[in-house]
Amino acid sequence: MSGRSPKAPRAPSSTRVGGLVVAAHGRHYLVAPDDGGAMLQCFPRGKRSEVAVGDRVVYELASADQGVIVEIGERRNLLYRSDQYKSKLFAANLDQLLVVLATEPHFSEDLLGRALVAAEANELKPLIVLNKTDVTDALEGARKRLEPYRALGYTVVEVSIKMQPEAARAALIEHLQGHSTLLLGQSGMGKSTLVNLLIPDAEVATREISTALNSGRHTTTFTRLYPLPDSADGEGGALIDSPGFQEFGLHHLTEGRLERAFPEFRPLLPNCRFYNCHHLQEPGCAILEAVADGRIRRERHALYAQLVHEASQIVR
C-alpha cells in the first residue's frame, strides 16, 4: 500500500495555509506548513477537538506563530484511543502499524492481539518487531509464542537494536520507507530505542515539540509524527509515536468490523447457519466449530469474545 499522504484540502485565500499535524497535546496542535516554513501552534475552531496527528489541515493565521484550524482534509483512516467511558481520535492517514515486542520482559499477547485487530479493522499492514534477539535464553520461547501469528501471515522482523544497531536499522527501514507507520510498544520493549535509532534527533525534536505545545516536562504524553529520512528514490515516510499502549482500545468498533478483523475468521463467516451469528454460543456456527477442532486458537476466539463484550458496554 502506498505511503503517500491524502490530498490536502485547498486553501482558498492567502490568509489560509495548508499543513500537516505533527503533534498533539490536549487541544494544542503543532502544524508543519506545506510551504516548508516554521512549525506553529494551532487550535481547533470551536470547543470540540476533532483533529488527529497525521491530518492534513487548513489553518488561518491568528498571529505570527499561532493559527486556527478551519478545515480537515479527507482521511484515509482514523484511529482511536478508547476506554469504557470515551473514545478519542489520535492518529490519521496511516497505512502500517508496527508493534515492538522483546524476548524479555515477557510481552502481552492480549495487547498484541488488540493491536493486530486495530490494524485489520483500519486496513493497516501489521508488522511485528521482535527486539532483543541477543537475549538467547529467551529467544526460542518468544519465537514459539509468535509462531501462531506467523502462521496467520503476519510479518515478524527479528532485531537486536542495542547490540546490532546498523543491521536493525537496515531491516526496519526496508519495511518503513514510503509508509506512514504507527508505532506501539509496551514499556521495556525498546520502542524509544527504536525511535532514536531511526530518527537521530528524536530527543531534541521531542523537547522542541513539548515546548511548542506548552506541555512542559510531560514529554511522553503527546502523540507526535517524525518524518523519516528520504531514501535514494526520494521516498521517506513517517513514524507516528503514541504513548499508552494499554489505553489503546477498540470499543468504537461494531461487531461486524470485529469479526472481519480476525483473518482466520473471514473465510468461515459465510458458513455460519445464521447470517447474524455472534460466534459466541449459536448453533451451526462455523467459527465455534473451527475452535473446537483446532483450526482457530481458543486464545484468539477468547480475545474476540472479550472485545465483543467490551463493545457491548458502551452507550452509543
From Swiss-Prot:
Positions of GTP binding: N131, K132, T133, D134, G185, Q186, S187, G188, M189, G190, K191, S192, T193
Cofactor-binding details, from the entry: Binds 1 zinc ion per subunit.
Residue span, CP-type G domain: 83-248
Recorded GO CC terms: cytoplasm
Pfam families: RsgA_GTPase
Record InterPro entries: G_CP_dom, NA-bd_OB-fold, P-loop_NTPase, Ribosome_biogen_GTPase_RsgA, RsgA_GTPase_dom, RsgA_N
GO process annotations (BP): ribosomal small subunit biogenesis
Residues binding Zn(2+), per UniProt: C272, C277, H279, C285
Subcellular location: Cytoplasm
Keywords assigned by UniProt, alphabetized: Cytoplasm, GTP-binding, Hydrolase, Metal-binding, Nucleotide-binding, Ribosome biogenesis, RNA-binding, rRNA-binding, Zinc
EC number, as in UniProt: 3.6.1.-
Molecular functions per Gene Ontology: GTP binding; GTPase activity; metal ion binding; rRNA binding
HAMAP family: GTPase_RsgA
Assembly and binders: Monomer. Associates with 30S ribosomal subunit, binds 16S rRNA.
UniProt family annotation: Belongs to the TRAFAC class YlqF/YawG GTPase family. RsgA subfamily.
Protein name: Small ribosomal subunit biogenesis GTPase RsgA
Organism: Paraburkholderia phytofirmans (strain DSM 17436 / LMG 22146 / PsJN)
Encoding gene per record: rsgA
